[in-house]
């Protein structure tokens, strides 16, 4: 059997901790690296910080009396410090853990994941025979996905009655474990093997869907969108079979469906399939009021934009922005689309004027204004003239007489535009109006 436990830990522990990640041991300076006592003290402090310190007890016998048996032989005893809200860890799952292993009455671990992967938690696949039996048995008797537990493992459930000389003694060992995550890779396979009566149960549905969603998230992060889509589609199929027994369970199933359809919309957007995005949004319409759901409206807009239906896209983006006025991403999209629409209108007008050999109106008058101001007014008039609907553009207050005369002169060259002036002096207001012909 290939053991997960590092049997050569004692020989390497000083080297590993000295050459380890500085963030893990910030208080260890270069001048103290050769000091064995400081190194051991830092090991002890780190286990405390990571909640991997050995608990206070008089003896393993006294400690074991307060634990529960995981095996009828008493070779594995467990004390759950903190348990997750999910199901028991599946026997064939992949777990992410930190552990520290201690001999009786020791305060420094003889082995720990803190010395592996630069101090990162260790990911282990259960059911492969690559870790000691006692550790695997204990992990499958706690609820995940997050938990803390202590395991007291006898030699028979660890490395055998003789240990692994010279490093591993033939003695009981205490494992202090922090479980960070559980990945149920075979949930879908197990679900398909269940009878229909089991498949419809709420607990089975939730466990399977959570596993499929977790796997889909990992695939999405790796940009494997097609595989993620398959997982979300399977999650929808599982949810449709579910028969919740209470109103709360029914609401939970509904929320999971909403989540799955939204994630499918995102994945289809990533794979450039706007019609599929629309289909997912329409599925959401049958579950919730999408007019009150910003993300659904956003992807309605995305789908229409991808299909070239700019006006429809703007309509949905505006609805989404109304729900989340501070959403900068939606605001930027609307601003970009507005600019694109204006540019398109101006270019379209220029194209038709050229097609009919009509020159763009221009003024020959000379005004006592800045050339940039005159150019900006002309551009604005061309943009307004290119619009098909009524429009009104308010100019800043405080314009000089020459600036107002310049505006009037340029506007007069556009038959569909007019200038509206009201007020006097500093209160004078000037606006350019696009009339409907």
From Swiss-Prot:
**What GO MF terms are annotated?**
Hsp90 protein binding; peptidyl-prolyl cis-trans isomerase activity
| Sequence ranges of the TPR repeats | 209-242, 258-294, 295-327
Any single Gene Ontology cellular-component annotation: cytoplasm
**All copies of domain PPIase FKBP-type, residue ranges:** 92-178
Repeat is among the record's keywords: yes
* Keywords, alphabetical: Cytoplasm, Differentiation, Meiosis, Oogenesis, Repeat, RNA-mediated gene silencing, TPR repeat
The answer, when asked if Cytoplasm is one of the entry's keywords, is: yes
Q: What InterPro entries does this protein map onto?
A: FKBP6/shu, PPIase_dom_sf, PPIase_FKBP_dom, TPR-like_helical_dom_sf, TPR_2, TPR_rpt
Instruction: Please state where this protein is localized.
Output: Cytoplasm
Q: From which domain of life does this come?
A: Eukaryota
Choose any GO biological process term that the UniProt entry carries and state it.
piRNA processing
Per the record, the similarity remark reads:
Belongs to the FKBP6 family.
Query: Assembly and partners?
Result: Interacts with Hsp83.
Described function: Co-chaperone required during oogenesis to repress transposable elements and prevent their mobilization, which is essential for the germline integrity. Acts via the piRNA metabolic process, which mediates the repression of transposable elements during meiosis by forming complexes composed of piRNAs and Piwi proteins and govern the methylation and subsequent repression of transposons. Acts as a co-chaperone via its interaction with Hsp83/HSP90 and is required for the biogenesis of all three piRNA major populations.
- Kindly give the PANTHER family that the UniProt entry links to this protein: INACTIVE PEPTIDYL-PROLYL CIS-TRANS ISOMERASE FKBP6 (PTHR46674:SF1)
Q: What name appears for this protein in its UniProt entry? A: Inactive peptidyl-prolyl cis-trans isomerase shutdown
Instruction: Please give the organism.
Output: Bombyx mori (Silk moth)
Q: Which gene encodes it?
A: shu
